[in-house]
């Protein structure tokens, strides 16, 4: 009987994955700080990324160094935001957000991923119209009842509240501009989300199966694993990919 990966191998794999996550978050911190300054109290975008970093157990020292590099107090690489759009097999729309110091390298890597998996890159705006940019705050029913969360969300200026009884989850939907304010006002009432992000949500999902589902899953996994890629969004039904 074959043996599974050793404890050391599993730890190395976990450390590698954690390192990639940290690298991507540090780039996000840099871009946010350069765009809006290094003070998170006056830079909502930076505040969001710092919260994400802390949730990933990044130390405050690492966060502070990333901010200092971004605002010129320490030497560092300069990154820019780029977005690519395209189609996976089955007509699945895909948005790829990247941070890069070399556009040629990044577009080559992204295009290769699409081609390898039977998809194709599109032009700017070719699929973005199928998505909405939203702030999403996720709460567990255990922290408060549905009525209390809904009332607090509406008072704070949320756009909508979605209740998922089967998943024991309540989602508060905001505009990107109101995201930080709603999150902070609800936190002041003791309502802390277990997950919070500004994301793209598809207007409707596409169901795929068989070999198409395998190729779509492969493409999304390859894209997410690229160093320059920060986020990957698609309108594929996640249940059909076994990701829910």
Curated annotation (Swiss-Prot):
GO MF, any single term: DNA binding
One cellular component term from this protein's GO annotations in UniProt: cytosol
Chief place of localization: cytoplasm
UniProt-annotated location(s): Cytoplasm
Keyword Zinc-finger set for record: no
Gene3D superfamilies referenced in this protein's UniProt entry, alphabetically: 1.10.10.200, 3.30.70.980
Keywords: Cytoplasm, DNA-binding, Transcription, Transcription regulation
Keyword Transcription: yes
Matching InterPro entries: Integrase-like_N, TACO1_YebC-like_2nd/3rd_dom, TACO1_YebC_N, Transcrip_reg_TACO1-like, Transcrip_reg_TACO1-like_dom3, YebC-like
GO biological process, one term: regulation of DNA-templated transcription
Family designation: Belongs to the TACO1 family.
Protein name stated in the entry: Probable transcriptional regulatory protein XF_1906
Organism: Xylella fastidiosa (strain 9a5c)
